[in-house]
Amino acid sequence: MRQAEIERNTFETKIKLSLNLDAQDPVDIQTGVGFFDHMLTLFARHGRMSLVVKADGDLWVDSHHTVEDVGIVLGQALKEALGDKAGINRYGTSFVPMDETLGMASLDLSGRSFLVFDASFDNPKLGNFDTELIEEFFQALAFNVQMNLHLKILHGKNNHHKSESLFKATGRALREAITVNPDIHGVNSTKGML
């Protein structure tokens, strides 16, 4: 089974995360940030992976540390669960419509960290959630799993729909990339490693 459990404690956050790429349940996200919990649940469900997250952060400051640190730990868990990446597709792309919004995620589990984030939000807040933290989360995720991640909102107006489209698209693209392909022998790279 491709799985990982990671616990990370700092002065700002305490995070315990378990991930199983070959199971779909359970999915249980408890970060103390309701909107973020919703987005991570969508990510896991559309990525068809089991994800359990318990985070206690300094939410009296704001949710920045919690959101970023969950991205760090999730990236580390994905990297560990994927091991040497033998037999996986490596690449994944997904377009996800959400009413008037169309979002895209395209990624490469290359071992090279890079994020291109082409999405804007008309309001700085979604409820009490800072929309700038969406990019912070994906930056932390991409850099810690060591993947090249491109995210784009092709069109849309509603900020909730934009965010939901990006999280769903990333989950779906990741599922495509991590799927073991019987036609791939060894690692999907001319270098012989990722």
Swiss-Prot record:
Which reaction does this chain catalyze?
Answer: D-erythro-1-(imidazol-4-yl)glycerol 3-phosphate = 3-(imidazol-4-yl)-2-oxopropyl phosphate + H2O
Asked if Magnesium is a keyword of the record, the answer is no
Principal subcellular localisation of the protein: cytoplasm
User: Where is this chain's protein located in or outside the cell?
Assistant: Cytoplasm
Q: Which GO terms describe its cellular component?
A: cytoplasm
Q: Which SUPFAM superfamilies match?
A: Ribosomal protein S5 domain 2-like (SSF54211)
Q: Which PROSITE patterns match?
A: IGP_DEHYDRATASE_1 (PS00954), IGP_DEHYDRATASE_2 (PS00955)
Among InterPro entries, the record links this protein to: IGPD_sf (IPR038494), ImidazoleglycerolP_deHydtase (IPR000807), ImidazoleglycerP_deHydtase_CS (IPR020565), Ribosomal_Su5_D2-typ_SF (IPR020568)
List GO molecular-function terms, semicolon-separated.
imidazoleglycerol-phosphate dehydratase activity
Q: Which UniProt keywords apply?
A: Amino-acid biosynthesis, Cytoplasm, Histidine biosynthesis, Lyase
Q: Which E.C. number(s) belong to this protein? A: 4.2.1.19
Q: In which pathway does it act?
A: Amino-acid biosynthesis; L-histidine biosynthesis; L-histidine from 5-phospho-alpha-D-ribose 1-diphosphate: step 6/9
Domain of life assignment: Bacteria
Class in the EC hierarchy, top level: lyase
Identify its protein family: Belongs to the imidazoleglycerol-phosphate dehydratase family.
Q: What is this protein called?
A: Imidazoleglycerol-phosphate dehydratase
Q: Which organism is it from?
A: Streptococcus thermophilus (strain ATCC BAA-491 / LMD-9)
